[in-house]
């Protein structure tokens, strides 16, 4: 396993993704920064699901293993479907995540196709739309071709007086440094347009020895400590959860 327990997971998260800023800003700078918005690349939905009575994870895994993107495709629209299983132990709950890279609303279409394939017999989901907009902050391509990976999802809030405009400088520094390490890692930033004071940060980890690589190449780097301070100055995380994730191909 990549993360032996949540405590160790939190340690990785603290070092690699806790949120932040530049330094003190005067009023005009803060107002200017508040006007800067993320350039989103996709919209995203997260649906919480639970296995129906009489069905197990083996049934779900069998269903997902035979599910092909081609059966869900509509007009060459680019999208991703990820399934998240809570760590360290999951019994009957999971999350389905849709990422839509187009301006067209494809969620109802995909849900209908899943239903026709028999998904409703296996599990029930809360299909309350709570649309997020997101962007990839960095994606080191080293060995990122796995459909199975570990995902750490953090729900965070900006500290008073801080926002994406102040945070982006620390993000850019973080991305530049991590990219130079050639680690199989991806970071995503998601937010709601009607709630700019909060966001979701996602770490996608594609390698089993990720923690040791981070420890040797990043934690001991003095630049990492400065970036961590900037992150903490800008924002705080409410909670962090770790999942075994699966990309439907």
Which positions does each model-derived feature cover?
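Positively charged n-region of N-terminal signal peptides that target proteins for export
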Residues: 1-9
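Sec-dependent N-terminal signal peptides
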Residues: 9-19
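Short S/T/G/P-rich N-terminal loop/turn motif that feeds into the first structured element of a domain
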Residues: 22-225, 230-249
């Amino acid at each position: 396993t990549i993360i032996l327990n949540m405590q160790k997971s939190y340690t990785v998260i603290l070092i690699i993704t806790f949120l932040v800023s530049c330094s003190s800003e005067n009023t005009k700078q803060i107002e200017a920064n508040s006007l800067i918005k993320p350039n989103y690349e996709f919209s995203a939905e997260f649906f919480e699901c639970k296995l129906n009575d009489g069905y197990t994870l083996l049934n779900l895994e069998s269903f997902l293993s035979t599910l092909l993107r081609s059966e869900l495709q509509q007009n060459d629209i680019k999208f991703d479907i990820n399934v998240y299983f809570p760590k360290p132990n999951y019994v009957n709950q999971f999350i389905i995540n849709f990422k839509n890279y187009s301006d067209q609303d494809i969620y109802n279409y995909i849900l209908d196709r899943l239903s026709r394939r028999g998904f409703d017999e296996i599990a029930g989901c809360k299909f309350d739309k709570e649309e997020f907009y997101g962007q990839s902050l960095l994606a080191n391509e080293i060995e990122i071709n796995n459909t199975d990976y570990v995902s750490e999802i953090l729900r965070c809030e900006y500290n008073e007086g801080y926002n994406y405009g102040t945070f982006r400088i620390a993000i850019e520094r973080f991305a530049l440094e991590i990219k130079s390490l050639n680690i199989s890692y991806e970071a995503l930033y998601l937010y709601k347009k009607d709630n700019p004071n909060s966001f979701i940060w996602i770490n996608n980890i594609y390698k089993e020895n990720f923690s040791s690589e981070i420890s040797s190449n990043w934690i001991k780097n003095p630049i990492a400590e400065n970036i961590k301070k900037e992150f903490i100055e800008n924002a705080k995380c409410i909670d962090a959860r770790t999942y075994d994730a699966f990309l439907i191909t």
